[in-house]
Amino acid sequence: MFAPIIAIDAMGGDFGPHCVVPASIAFLAENPSSQLILVGQPALLEELLSRHPSLDRQRLRVHAASEVIGSDERPSQALRGKPDASMRVALELVRDGCAQACVSAGNTGALMALSRHLLKTLPGIDRPAMVTAVPTEKGHCHLLDLGANVDCSAEHLYQFAVMGAVAAEALGCASPRVALLNVGVEEIKGNQQVKLAASLLQKAEGLNFAGYIEGDGLYRGEADVVVCDGFVGNILLKASEGLAAMVSARIEQRFRDGLAAKLVGALALPLLRRLRGDIAPARYNGASFLGLQGIVVKSHGSAAEEGFQSALRRAALEVRENLPQRLHGRLEHLLL
């Protein structure tokens, strides 16, 4: 059986190894063919791992790295300094063929800069894009870019659309519907970059371009891949996560107001828990860096154990599907 090997920046994120270690152990329990490499400070990692004496250490190894890239450090600092940072070392393991994917909850800008520097982009790709799954009425859609590219040309949006479509196909969506996020669905709507990107996508053979989509259409499941620049995508993603948390909290509060509400709440609790699970950010945690010659998945910095597990699952799936190679094989036929 194929055994994905994933290198983990164990020191990144708000909780560092205190989240990464238990999430890694839980991931290995549900994925018996996978192997993990925890990159970070050995003394701390070994102390946390020692609390799990039954753990199969053949499948979970520690790789030493003495430095950590802080959340407030600039990408340029990450590139020039800290050669022994856990994030950098984890990416070097992918570059050198010791691992097939890297997962980090650390500094997003630093992770993107180091990924581009160490792994390089696929031929024909100017900029990698961040993509993740977003829940919809019909399941989920793939949204990109999520913040890696704040300012985008029409050509960049076109490349994102092509990469998103190929990735969606590789992850099980046949002939994915691709749409550009816009302020309206009419052809006259949108800024110049979006209009030019639409013109390019209309001419692309082998791409199922569905035109423009508005924010509400995204959640109705009117497209399988939704493309926008990183400025819009990041705001949309954060607003969606905040809205989901607010709705969940409001519903819980209403069911605690009075005896009758509590009785109704008790009956509705299983359904509400299922609904919360369907839209929980932790379930969809893990944004992939598309367009690189290797697999990199960014976990939310504030993700807890369940969320980090989701990021590991996404990385393992992309390894099994050989995503960079599949992208490379299709991109040369679709890129301008």
From Swiss-Prot:
Known catalytic reactions: a fatty acyl-[ACP] + phosphate = an acyl phosphate + holo-[ACP]
Keyword set, alphabetical order: Cytoplasm, Lipid biosynthesis, Lipid metabolism, Phospholipid biosynthesis, Phospholipid metabolism, Transferase
InterPro entries xrefs: FA_synthesis, Phospholipid_synth_PlsX-like
Any one Gene Ontology BP term: phospholipid biosynthetic process
Cellular component terms (Gene Ontology): cytoplasm
This enzyme's EC code(s): 2.3.1.274
Domain of life: Bacteria
The protein's enzyme class: transferase
A Pfam family it matches: FA_synthesis
Coiled-coil region list: none
MF terms (GO), sorted A to Z: phosphate:acyl-[acyl carrier protein] acyltransferase activity
Localization per Swiss-Prot or TrEMBL: Cytoplasm
SUPFAM superfamilies the UniProt entry points to: Isocitrate/Isopropylmalate dehydrogenase-like
Pathway: Lipid metabolism; phospholipid metabolism
Principal location: cytoplasm
Family: Belongs to the PlsX family.
Quaternary structure (record): Homodimer. Probably interacts with PlsY.
NCBIfam families, A to Z: plsX (TIGR00182)
Biological function: Catalyzes the reversible formation of acyl-phosphate (acyl-PO(4)) from acyl-[acyl-carrier-protein] (acyl-ACP). This enzyme utilizes acyl-ACP as fatty acyl donor, but not acyl-CoA.
Name assigned to this protein: Phosphate acyltransferase
Organism (species): Pseudomonas paraeruginosa (strain DSM 24068 / PA7) (Pseudomonas aeruginosa (strain PA7))
